[in-house]
Amino acid sequence: MTKLFSLLLVISFLSLFSSAATSSSSRPPPKFLGSAFARSKPNRNSPPPYRYETRYFRQNLDHFSFAPLPQFTQRYLVGSSDKWSRNGPIFFYCGNEGDIDWFAANTGFVWEIAPKFSALVIFAEHRYYGESMPYGSQERAYKDAKSMSYFTTEQALADFTVLLTDLKQNLSSEESPVVLFGGSYAGMLAAWMRLKYPHVAIGALASSAPILQFEDIVPPETFYDIVSNDFRRESLSCFEAIKKSWDALDRLGKVHDGLTSLSRKFRLCHKLNNTQQLSDWLSSAYSYLAMVNYPFPSGFMMPLPAYPIKEVCKRIDNDPNGNDLLDRIFAGASIYYNYTGNVSCFDLDDDPHGLSGWDWQACTEMVMPMSSSRENSMFQPYDFDYTAYKEQCVQSYNVTPRPRWMTTEFGGHDIRRALKTFGSNIIFSNGLLDPWSGGGVLANISESVTALVTELGAHHVDLRASSPEDPQWLVELRESEVELIKGWIRDYYKQRRKYFSM
């Protein structure tokens, strides 16, 4: 394989928002980890790491209309039920923005703790992702704004609720306590589902769920400030080198044959059209490195060493050959894009046949303002420009974003009061190395809406499978989560016995 075509999906909104401007412009905002693999398929030739059966369920296309509309088939995965008994606990993972097999393979925590509770494990796929395509195919589902109009978080939550209700009835287990799980976007869904449908599940673990990353609830520069701080804490000289590299890229790109030189220097499969393509490619690498800065080797996105930012900065700081700045930047980025050394050239082009589902979501409901500050960020400075953002969404999908809809639907500036008044049994776990933690719940809301925060945690690291290299703080974090879930289930059965003894 001579091209790393899977990189295409890592470059956030590149096809939507590519721009040569670096200030007061709409730049490609970052995606969640799952978005990077929204269109990728797991390796079907290797067996899944956990035992489960693939099943399908007929869902209504529109849960909020009584008009006759077609149904679609939703995929879900059911774990081994050897230890599960009727009315026993159900652990339900709310599907992210991608193929559900991939999330099941990378959420070892749920599989590992399920036997301790004799729980049945369910992973449900999100509509419009993986095999759960309305209208029978992705091409037809993604055809236009009309065919994608049912592609919303509200419809997805209703899918999960209907599926769970039907499943419990078919299993004759209407009294089974359900615990919701999710990381990143799925963590947001788990928290929102617990709020919106509290009768369906007794609690939710929402890992790395940035439910506050809307409107101006948190400063728009928060995400890139955290990424920058991750690099600064590792090496100030590395941080400074990356910050200087953007001007170096632009200067070389403007000279005669400069784009050709850059294309050769960064081993690109095709000649650059502009320097912004390369800047976006590098920005994506730095952002995702911050998300997956795990304390153990991982292959969650790409094969990476433990603490990959440390390794990137080693290459940028310690070049024995005395290479120039951009050569060192390429060497650092290669830790992310080519740690195995198997890639001969890099393809920066996005999918020519269409846009990913997450781009649609970001152009409709999931509007998360992002900017990069001159003072604290190592990235090119820019301001969030909603007008430009909206124009690109109209151009791409013929839709106008609704930046206030998610806060209207699930709680905005008063989300803490809403959680305290109406919420219960929700764990918000965040690691402060994760750039999405800036939009997360970082303090306890009430006795039962709990924030578990780790200083050295990255993006939903707690949901990954356990490893001998796990640091003590990660072991203790997972133990705390298990104890809280035990309490929810114990209280549920206690109340149920009390109710039936009356």
Task: Describe each PLM feature range.
Residues 2-120, 131, 433, 483-502:
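Catalytic-loop region of hydrolases
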Residues 68-72, 149-161, 474-483:
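Phosphate/oxyanion-binding active-site loops and adjacent basic polyanion-contact surfaces
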Residues 82-83, 88-90, 95-158, 448-466:
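Active-site machinery of serine-nucleophile hydrolases
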Residues 172-185:
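Alpha/beta-hydrolase fold nucleophile elbow
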Residues 180-182, 207, 429:
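Short beta-strand immediately N-terminal to the catalytic nucleophile in serine-hydrolase-like folds
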Residues 182-186, 190, 194, 434:
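Gly/Ala-rich beta-loop-alpha elbow adjacent to hydrolase catalytic centers
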Residues 199-317:
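A catalytic-pocket lid/entrance helix-loop region that shapes and gates access to the active site
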Residues 278-502:
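C-terminal subdomain of alpha/beta-hydrolase-fold enzymes, centered on the catalytic histidine
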